[in-house]
Curated annotation (Swiss-Prot):
Residues 55-145 form the UPAR/Ly6 domain. Forms oligomers. Its main location: secreted. One of its GO terms (molecular function) is identical protein binding. Pfam families: UPAR_LY6 (PF00021). N-glycosylated. It comes from the Eukaryota. Residues 1-38 form the signal peptide. It comes from Rattus norvegicus (Rat). The keyword Disulfide bond applies. GO terms for cellular component: external side of plasma membrane; extracellular region; protein-containing complex. This is Lymphocyte antigen 6 complex locus protein G5c.
Length: 145
């Protein structure tokens, strides 16, 4: 064999050969990413967006007044002009489960809205507020109407 095919071999690589192979793979990945993604890699901002442009809300996927947050306690961010929301699912026997989250401007139609739930005997009541963490358990009674 002569030429390029003769230089390729299936024998085990030594430490130097492994390093060369890893460098070749890394170079191939970088070149492929540059070709596929173009300049988008350079467009990524080096800093996170300023947090003062967002409303910070309390998020809990399942909460009761007696036990607190049972599932998914977290914080969510939504652009200014949006709202924090707590959704109450209630019935006449005093059952009350809450879900807290962020709502964008398009979803604010639900604010201060009560409707029957798909389950007979229960209703859903939305409460919205517009200050940082206004829907967390400590602030909810003072800031949500």
């Amino acid at each position: 064999m002569s030429g390029l095919a003769a230089s390729w071999s299936l024998k085990p690589l030594g430490p130097h050969g492994v390093t060369q192979a890893l460098c070749a793979v890394l170079l191939a990945v970088l070149v492929t990413m540059n070709v596929v993604l173009g300049d988008t890699l350079l467009d990524i901002p080096s800093q996170s967006p300023p947090l003062n442009q967002y409303l910070h809300c309390y998020r809990c996927l399942l909460e009761t007044e007696e036990l607190g947050c049972l599932l998914g306690s977290d914080t969510c961010l939504t652009p200014l002009g949006s709202t924090c929301v707590t959704l109450h699912i209630k019935n006449s026997s005093g059952f009350n489960v809450m879900v807290s989250d962020c709502r964008n401007k398009e979803q604010m139609v639900d604010c201060s809205y009560t409707r029957a739930s798909p389950v007979f005997g229960f209703w859903i009541f939305y409460q919205c507020c517009f200050l940082d963490f206004c829907n967390n358990p400590k602030n909810r009674k003072n800031t949500m109407h």
